[in-house]
Each structure stands twice: as structure tokens, then as C-alpha cells.
Amino acid sequence: VENGGYELEKNYADFWMPSCTKDASSTGSYAWETTYAGKWYDGKTWKAGQGSLSKEIVLNLKLNSTHDYNGNGDGNTFSVYLGPRNRCATDICIASGWGACPVTPYFVEQFRNDPRFNACVWSCKDAGFSADESDSYEYTGYYTRKYAPMCFADGTRQEVGFQLGEQHQNITYYQDYTIMRYADVLLMHSELNGTADGLNKVRARVGLEPEDYSIENIRKERAIELAFEGVHFWDLMRYGKDGSYAAQEIAKAQNGAKVKNGGVETATKFAVDNFTSKKGLMQIPKTQITLSGNVLTQNAGW
């Protein structure tokens, strides 16, 4: 923690390319800054470049825009899920996608006033565009930003890798995926040692006042600091190993959440009993149980 050479980025939003992109209306052109390898637009063309790795990165999965459907290259194939179902206003750099992972109203209500919120989430209304709600499922009006697909700002809305002729747009997003960063380590250190030191270093980065140590404060801080980075679900699972704590927290966010399916307003439902009966675990494939000579036993509830 102290001698590994790691440190927090000065600005929280600068860690993710979609979060730190400058507004074209104010800069005249996009200068897409990033703390890792990326590309930027100089107002005329796209340029490839190898940025220096952020000192906040502990473990990083490097990705590029040369992936193809034959398995060549190492492209980002998940960002396409996170874009909205139709094209956005031209003053936002986020490309269209498959409309998955909409942000729940519960998250918005909890963290709207946190200084990290706009680096994590973008609002259709604030971006000045109306979604085609008839083509969306579980639409809430909010999408994740950190790993969103990126595109040109000229109104064509084409994804960058596709426009550059680098294979198919669904598999050529070049944003890296960070498996672990230093902020996560600091919060884990606080949790393990029962002190507020790491917690308050993370809070100080975004100008928040110090807090006393409590497991509740640690859990809330992790929920916003590491939002939409593939961490929160596993935090919920480890907080209660039988899946009951995770079920309780997921139900708060998903039971009765107002969404639109095909343009029709409805409310989501979360099957708590189904989740807890399986302790939140997936089914072990029967083929793997057979291959193990029945050493493996099926998870409860399946």
C-alpha cells in the first residue's frame, strides 16, 4: 500500500476515456485525454498513441481495435452492450449500442449529489437527446459512462474503430478494462484494518470531508467509487456468504423500479426467494461434474 509506487489520479474522471472527454462545444474539438493507451482527435484526424499507464492501475487488461471474429487480436467486446439503442446528440461522445445495463433509479437517488456521479453515469435528458423508448427494454433514462462505447462527434455517430476500418464495430472498442486499481486497494486496506485512513484518502480525491470508520461507510464508499466496474455484485456476495445480504440489497434497487419496456411504463421485479435458494450461485454445468468423476457437487437449489 505504501511502497508499491501506486497513487490516485488527481481527477477521478480522468481515469476513464468516456468520462474525461472534453465537450466539443467548449473546446472546439475533442481532446480525448486518457490515463492509459488510447487515441485522440486533433480536430482533423484520429491519431493512435501509447499513453503512459496510470499509477492508479494495479492490474489492467490491455485491449485494442484490431479484434476480428476469428479470434485474432484482443478487442473490447463488451462496451457495445452499454451504448443506448439509438444515436445520441452530437455533443456527447458515446456511440449507439445494445442498451444493456441501464442505471437504476435507486442508484441515481442515492448518489446524484456525489461528485463522482457524472463520471459514472450520463443522463439522456441532460445530453439533450430523446431515446427511442419503443426500441428499449428496462429504459430508465440513465446509462453507464466509464466503459461506454465511443464515437465521433461529427453527427455520424459511428463507433471509432469501425470508422477507422478496424474490423466490426461490435468488437473493436479500444478502452482497456481495469481489473484492480489503487482506490480499491485503499478501501480494502481500511476494511481489513478497521481504520478510516484509506477511506478518507479516496474521499479526499473528490473533495469530500473525512468520515469515521464503519463497515457501513466502507460499503457505501465502495458502491460509488467502484460503480460499474464489475465489483459491486461480488462485494454484496461476500458481505453475506449465503446470498441473503446480496438479495436484500438487490431487491432495494430492483423491486418496483420504474422502467419502460418498449415504451410502456412498468415496474421491475426481483425474485428474492429464487436468488436466496441458490445462495446467489450459478449452476455448475453437468458436463463438468461428470468430467470430475462426480467429485464436484451441484450448487444448492439447482
Report residues per predicted region.
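Short regulatory "switch" loops immediately downstream of catalytic or recognition motifs
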Residues: 7-22, 124-128, 144-162, 240, ...
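Long, intrinsically disordered, low-complexity segments
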Residues: 20-80, 169-172, 177, 203, ...
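An aromatic- and glycine-enriched ligand-binding surface/loop that stacks and positions planar moieties
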Residues: 1-135
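Extended, hydrophobic/aromatic-rich amphipathic alpha-helical segments that build helical scaffolds
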Residues: 1-3, 59, 117-122, 176-204, ...
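Flexible, polar/acidic helix-loop-strand segments at domain edges
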Residues: 103-181
